[in-house]
Regions:
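A cross-family signal for N-terminal binding/gating loops and helix N-caps
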Residues: 1-177
């Protein structure tokens, strides 16, 4: 299988920039396993396609404002996206620019109320950062962080709650499903 097998044209005007007011009006693509035919529907029609014994899996993870903008001691800017909580204040992260965030690099966020040190680089290019702070980490993220929107979403997010799934409860996702 080649990566090019997954390339396709997607006109920009078909990419929703904001969530629909009525979530059950979102589009639903169905596949008939017997014929291979696909059909377009709307989400509120989902019960029409379910059968007794079908299993639905609900994603109840809340997206955290995992995108942080900080500065290095040199004054250079750093973007950090939290990917995975490793415990003890350590997080696996994406950093930009990656070359400028080598182990030992210190980063300050906000007015210094949240700081981090790059403690190691992973083979895949991700970095492990150790965060230092007083208080509750998720509260600092709510104050300092932004939702990590995908690059094809160009509009600024105005309501963090609209980016959550309707089932969201437990904080931890770095992006919406």
């Amino acid at each position: 299988m080649k990566k090019s097998d997954f390339y396709y044209d997607l006109p920009p005007e078909l990419i929703a920039q904001t969530p629909l007011e009525r979530r059950d009006a979102s589009r639903l693509l169905t596949l008939d396993k017997r014929t291979g035919a696909t059909e377009h529907h709307v989400f509120h029609e989902l019960p029409d396609f379910l059968n007794e014994g079908d299993c639905l899996v609900m994603n109840d993870s809340r997206v955290i404002p995992a995108r942080l903008f900080g500065t290095r001691p040199t004054g250079g800017s750093v973007e950090v996206v939290l990917l995975r909580d490793l415990g003890g204040g350590d997080w696996e992260c994406l950093t930009r620019p990656g070359r400028k965030t080598q182990p030992g690099t210190h980063i300050s966020f906000g007015n210094g109320e949240l700081t981090a040190e790059v403690i190691r680089a992973e083979a895949d290019g991700n970095k492990v950062l150790h965060f230092n702070y007083d208080g509750i980490f998720l509260e600092l993220l709510d104050k300092l962080g932004k939702m990590p929107l995908p690059p094809y979403i160009k509009e600024e997010l105005t309501d963090k709650e609209r980016y959550q799934t309707v089932y969201s409860r437990d904080p931890g996702s770095a992006a919406a499903p």
